[in-house]
């Protein structure tokens, strides 16, 4: 046999530098994560980009109603934070471009900094203060 069929230069041969699955995850301490989120929220407050609302009690789960609420708040690219998983808010906001919903337990620094405005309910503010204060 003059050649090896598994050599990379032959049809059906191997790949020279094949992609290798890599884990790009970086461990971050709890205190660092909390401090980063505190800093991000403080930054939004200083820029007047954090809006506190009494509640987001929508009559129905309609995108149009959520759009009206966000237009009145002048929040075009917004992160809507609620205390618990409010299905009406989630269903109303999911079809609006550049609007994302989150609960107090699921917010992160990336989402806070990515959005221009952060809309938070009073219950969510109380929960955030309880956890991060």
Region spans (language model):
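Short, small-residue-biased leader/transition segments that mark boundaries at the very start
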Residues: 1-2
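Extended polybasic, low-complexity segments that bind anionic RNA or targeting/receptor surfaces
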Residues: 18-133
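Active-site metal-coordination/substrate-binding segment of hydrolases
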Residues: 10-11, 15-16
